[in-house]
């Protein structure tokens, strides 16, 4: 079985965390690919990784691409570092960036010298789910920083980037709240 079966439902976007009675694997089986706007079904995930634009890319990954396109950021030949390897943002975003001829590096908690990797980027995307982990020493002047993180510290929303520290140095940065995450 799949849902929705009613024609009145156009698309499905799943919010996490899931209720305990519903597993990620089961959800992937239930959602029809033509309704799966966040690309959690195996069919749409495979399309993203194959560069097939007939499915849906995950919303947040697509939002990052739309943002960069809106500001006419040419990705061709640019070094893009993505900090985060989730199946919902990091990995699919890497595939979308590759489709625009960027040179992509994915960093994660086990990446050695992560600060150096990030500092070498033309475009840095933070989507690790770790509050304010990206500090000024991760960045360089002229860099574009896209903060996808949504975290709460002492009841206040913040991103994966230490905005106050980093915004003084980089060419452009997205805020949290008010950004793409």
Give short role names for the model-derived ranges.
Residues 1-8:
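Short, small-residue-biased leader/transition segments that mark boundaries at the very start
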Residues 6, 122, 147:
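Acidic active-site catalytic centers that drive phospho-/nucleotidyl reactions
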Residues 10-14, 126, 146-147:
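Redox-cofactor binding/interface segments in oxidoreductases and associated redox assembly factors
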Residues 13-75, 79:
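Anion-binding alpha/beta catalytic cores of soluble intermediary-metabolism enzymes, centered on
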Residues 15, 83, 176:
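Conserved residues at the C-terminal ends of beta-strands
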Residues 15-21, 129-132, 150-152, 179:
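Short glycine-rich anion-binding loops that position phosphate/pyrophosphate groups of nucleotides
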Residues 23-46, 146-180:
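Rossmann-fold NAD(P)-binding glycine/threonine-rich loop
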Residues 46, 54-144, 153-167:
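Glycine-rich phosphate/diphosphate-binding loop of Rossmann-like nucleotide-binding domains
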């Amino acid at each position: 079985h799949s849902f929705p079966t009613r024609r009145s439902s156009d698309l499905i976007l799943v919010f996490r965390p899931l209720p305990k009675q519903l597993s990620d694997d089961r959800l992937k089986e239930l959602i029809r690919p033509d309704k799966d706007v966040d690309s959690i079904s195996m069919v749409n995930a495979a399309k993203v990784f194959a560069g097939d634009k007939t499915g849906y890319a995950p919303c947040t990954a697509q939002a990052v691409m739309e943002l960069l396109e809106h500001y006419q950021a040419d990705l061709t030949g640019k070094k893009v570092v993505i900090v985060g390897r989730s199946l919902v943002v990091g990995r699919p975003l890497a595939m979308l960036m590759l489709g625009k001829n960027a040179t992509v590096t994915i960093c994660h908690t086990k990446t050695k010298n992560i600060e150096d990797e990030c500092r070498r980027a033309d475009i840095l995307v933070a989507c690790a789910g770790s509050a304010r982990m990206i500090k000024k020493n991760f960045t360089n002047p002229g860099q574009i920083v896209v903060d996808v993180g949504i975290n709460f510290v002492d009841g206040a929303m913040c991103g994966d980037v230490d905005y106050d520290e980093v915004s003084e140095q980089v060419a452009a940065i997205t805020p949290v709240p008010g950004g793409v995450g």
